[in-house]
């Protein structure tokens, strides 16, 4: 591993850490961002708030289709494919957001 120098070490790549690192880098500091996970975003983005809200969104959609019968629009009962649902949550939601943070880090030299 090569020796490197940093002016600011930010511990934690969650919703407090990465914005702080971005702000410092935008002001010309050489920043290193350290996070325990392989993906930036911390617990909230990777396995907490954001994935939970994505799954709650699906639950809301299912409920709305049931309630639409009151307005004359009905659907067949939903069929959940848990493997596809998890894949969507992991790639289209979490993967897209962590990828965006990773790219923003690269652009700023973090």
Where do the protein language model's features map onto the residues?
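Beta1/beta-strand and adjacent pyrophosphate-binding region of the FAD-binding site
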Residues: 2-16
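Glycine-rich flavin
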Residues: 2-5, 23-29, 35-110
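The conserved SAM/SAH-binding core of class I Rossmann-like methyltransferase domains
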Residues: 11, 34-35
């Amino acid at each position: 591993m090569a020796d490197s120098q940093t002016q600011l070490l930010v511990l934690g790549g969650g919703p407090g850490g990465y914005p702080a690192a971005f702000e410092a880098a935008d002001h010309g500091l050489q920043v290193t961002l350290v996070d325990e996970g392989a993906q930036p975003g911390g617990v909230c983005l990777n396995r907490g708030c954001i994935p939970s809200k994505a799954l709650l969104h699906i639950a809301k959609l299912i409920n709305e289709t049931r309630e639409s019968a009151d307005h004359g629009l009905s659907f067949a009962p939903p069929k959940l494919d848990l493997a596809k649902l998890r894949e969507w949550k992991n790639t289209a939601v979490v993967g897209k957001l962590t990828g965006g943070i990773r790219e923003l880090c690269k652009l700023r030299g973090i």
